[in-house]
A protein has these predicted regions:
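Short helix-capping segments at alpha-helix termini
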Residues: 27-29, 51-58, 129, 159-161
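C-terminal catalytic/substrate-binding lobe primarily of soluble NAD(P)-dependent oxidoreductases
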Residues: 133, 156-394
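N-terminal Rossmann NAD(P)H-binding glycine-rich loop of SDR-like oxidoreductase domains
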Residues: 4-24
Length: 394
């Protein structure tokens, strides 16, 4: 008998606080016990007080756990049915938590965007997680819920037995450049700098190749990584080597709905030639600067871990994913929209995923699996009903 239904590890970090508040707000309707966990008892008590004051009758429990003290992580995992971790970077702090969940048969969720971490966890723990009947589900935030479920929604509107191709074009809107930069938390900024090196980008490409080698009997391919121009919207597409691609490909490998063959492309959508050229220049400068150790050290200083955008800035941020799906006999265009991608929407996606695993009759699939493979239509419904996401066929 587990003591808690859902435990949130890293609850006093920036995204952790937002997720804790969202979960506390949902307890009255969903009826689950909640614990918040971390290493700083004082901060946990402060958050507990604020949440219980705001949501009357919402009892919040506290667990002390530290990634540097593995017995405390094991104890935390053994005490709960579903464990959410917002403690990153996950390459540094994630494996201890995953391992504890695998051993104890505890379902695990995170919001990592670190492709190499996801790959390592699948290679190391998929078999043992399947044996212990643990669902290890990475990328349950903006990376990669919109891409994974947007693609899933798109292919559901195409004939099942035909070859399928999906292109995803993403855009994020903010009030202005200052607001856009302020919208990045310290943790996200540090993770991005860790990713932005040429070796990591090359490793990401190698990872896609490994996934493609697993694609029999279903053939899975990545669409050519070249710039796109969309005449209808006068917008340019820049190929993005991000974890979303890996997640979508893994979903396609495991589910029959994706058809006998499936191809996917993932692009950043930029409106107009001036912004397109400016974005290319900005990205090139950022990538170049991040290769020079002294400059990279200075870039790290621009954001502190724990920093993040205020509610006013978050309320101005929106995301939009446009999916173009094609099969032999049909073409469909899908729009997926939501609020502040980095934090507001992410906390809702993560929270709803945890509640979905706990309360919904989801498929009995275990191991290191994707959000779509784990939760499918059940989470798709929750995202639209509770997380302010809209999925539309245009």
């Amino acid at each position: 008998m587990r003591e808690y239904d859902i435990t949130l590890f890293g609850a006093t970090g920036f995204t952790g606080i937002l997720t804790a508040e969202y979960l506390a707000s949902r307890r009255a309707k969903e009826d689950f016990s909640l614990a918040i966990a971390g290493r700083n008892k004082g901060r946990l008590l402060g958050l507990k007080y604020e949440l219980e004051k705001k949501y009357i009758g919402s009892e919040i429990n506290i667990l002390l756990a530290d990634v540097d003290e593995e017995p405390s992580i094991r104890k935390m995992a053994e005490a709960t049915k579903v464990l959410i971790s917002t403690v990153g970077p996950y390459l540094l702090y994630g494996e201890t938590v995953v391992r504890a969940c695998v051993v104890s048969g505890t379902h695990y969720l995170d919001l990592t965007g670190e492709g190499s971490f996801v790959e390592q966890m699948e290679l190391k723990y998929h078999k043992s997680a399947n044996e212990s009947e643990a669902k290890i589900i990475n990328c349950c935030g903006y990376d990669s819920i919109p891409a994974d479920f947007g693609t899933y929604f798109t292919i559901k509107n195409l004939p099942t037995t035909e070859l399928k191709e999906v292109e995803c074009f993403i855009s994020v809107t903010s009030k202005d450049f200052t607001s856009a930069f302020s919208s990045i938390s310290g943790g996200t900024w540090h993770s991005a700098l860790g990713f932005m090196n040429l070796q990591e980008i090359e490793r990401q490409r190698d990872m896609y190749a490994k996934i493609l080698l697993r694609s029999r009997p279903r053939e899975i391919t990545v669409l050519p990584t070249e710039f796109r121009f969309r005449e209808a919207s006068k917008s340019f597409g820049i190929p993005l080597p991000v974890v979303d691609i890996e997640v979508v490909l893994r979903s396609a490998l495991q589910l029959e709905e994706y058809g006998p063959a499936f191809s996917y492309g993932h692009f950043l959508s930029i409106q107009g030639l001036p912004k397109f050229l400016g974005s290319l220049l900005g990205f090139s400068l950022f990538l170049g600067a991040s290769q020079i150790p002294p400059i990279k050290d200075l870039l790290y200083l621009l954001k502190k871990n724990g920093d993040g955008p205020n509610e006013e800035i978050r309320s101005t941020n929106k995301f939009h994913h446009s999916f173009i799906g094609k099969s032999g006999s049909k073409t469909v265009q899908v729009s997926v929209t939501g609020g502040d991608p980095g934090y507001g929407a992410t906390s809702k996606m993560l929270g709803e995923a945890a509640i979905c695993i706990l309360n919904d009759p989801i498929p009995e699939r275990y191991g290191v699996i994707t959000p779509v493979v784990a939760m499918g239509d059940f989470l798709l419904e929750r995202l639209q009903k509770n997380a302010d996401m809209k999925f539309k066929v245009l």
